[in-house]
């Protein structure tokens, strides 16, 4: 890593940590590299809510809006629960489901800010195809590559 790249990353981590301190969390987008789907995830939410959220397969603008919406929705509740369908999160009346994430390997910025020992539960927001069928349910038209289940 060059000195310029190191300086950029150091500054980015500093700004991210400062924003988390001011607002409680950030949403970190990870763009597609052409071989994997984009995803966005919260960092810092575990300090107030006890968990983090992630959404795969949608661009950062959409995922950012959905994740912020869910943070507000869960603020005064027990939080996500597995396989519960939630209304009013996506446009056109589509529901989302929540599922626990099995591996935390994709959340490197979280580890960079909070350390390797920080392992809060991550909940994935799963969205359906245009017929309302969720992956991995039979008949879902969304491929594993299009919306990886973490």
Regions found by a protein language model. Give the residues of each.
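A structural motif
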Residues: 39-43
């Amino acid at each position: 890593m060059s000195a310029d790249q190191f300086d950029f990353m150091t500054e980015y981590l500093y700004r991210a940590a400062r924003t988390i301190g001011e607002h409680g969390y950030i949403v970190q987008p990870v763009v597609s590299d052409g071989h994997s789907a984009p995803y966005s995830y919260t960092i810092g939410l575990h300090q107030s809510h006890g968990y983090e959220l992630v959404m795969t397969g949608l661009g950062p603008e959409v995922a950012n809006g959905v994740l912020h919406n869910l943070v507000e929705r869960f603020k005064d509740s027990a939080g996500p629960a597995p396989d519960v369908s939630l209304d009013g999160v996506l446009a056109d009346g589509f529901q989302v489901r929540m599922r626990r994430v099995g591996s935390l390997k994709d959340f490197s910025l979280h580890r960079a800010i909070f350390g390797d020992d920080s392992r809060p539960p991550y909940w994935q927001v799963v969205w359906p195809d245009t017929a309302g069928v969720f992956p991995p349910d039979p008949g879902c038209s969304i491929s594993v590559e299009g919306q990886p289940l973490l």
